[in-house]
């Protein structure tokens, strides 16, 4: 008897979970949530780019250990500080426009990194500050995702958007090989 009640209770819980999952996807805007995830993912790839490339860059420019550490830390610190600026932009311009402005800076920075002269340490630090704009993606992606979902689903929405942190692993896996292949 108790066993049957337990099975019945478990079945009802599974049904509720299925309903919750279904209602989550109906409650918000999945394309915006996926866009927030990809925005976050790509931003994280760019933000941490100097870390996976540090060995190659430090060998090419004969950087000291301290210089290499500063080079890797600069985009992280800049990103942390630029989140405040990006947050203000998000509040005034809304996430889409603020994100577009951020991406223009990021694309310009990547173009300079690829085609420009980064033969001096100061140039690397400047690039690091500019790449920090990608680190401000928190202030764009999270409001973009959460504004489309009611409070009871915001944890799930933010979890999905926040999974864009996986961009750090993707950068570590692919950036060194791409740098060797394309410069």
Each PLM stretch: what is its role?
Residues 96-99:
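Primarily marks hydrophobic transmembrane alpha-helices of the MFS/SLC 12-helix fold
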């Amino acid at each position: 008897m108790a066993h049957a009640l337990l099975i019945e209770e478990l079945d009802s819980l599974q049904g509720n979970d299925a309903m919750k999952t279904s209602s989550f996807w109906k409650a918000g805007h999945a394309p915006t949530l996926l866009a927030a995830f990809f925005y976050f993912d790509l931003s994280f790839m760019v933000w941490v780019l100097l870390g996976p490339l540090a060995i190659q860059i430090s060998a090419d420019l004969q950087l000291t250990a301290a210089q290499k550490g500063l080079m890797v830390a600069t985009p992280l610190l800049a990103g942390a500080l630029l989140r405040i600026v990006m947050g203000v932009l998000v509040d005034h311009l809304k996430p889409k426009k603020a994100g577009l402005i951020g991406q223009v800076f990021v694309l310009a920075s990547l173009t300079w990194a690829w085609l420009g002269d980064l033969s001096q340490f100061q140039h690397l630090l400047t690039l690091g500050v500019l790449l920090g704009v990608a680190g401000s993606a928190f202030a764009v992606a999270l409001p973009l995702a959460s504004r489309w979902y009611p409070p009871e689903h915001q944890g799930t929405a933010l979890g999905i958007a926040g999974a864009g942190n996986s961009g750090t692993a993707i950068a570590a896996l692919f950036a060194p090989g791409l740098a060797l292949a394309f410069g």
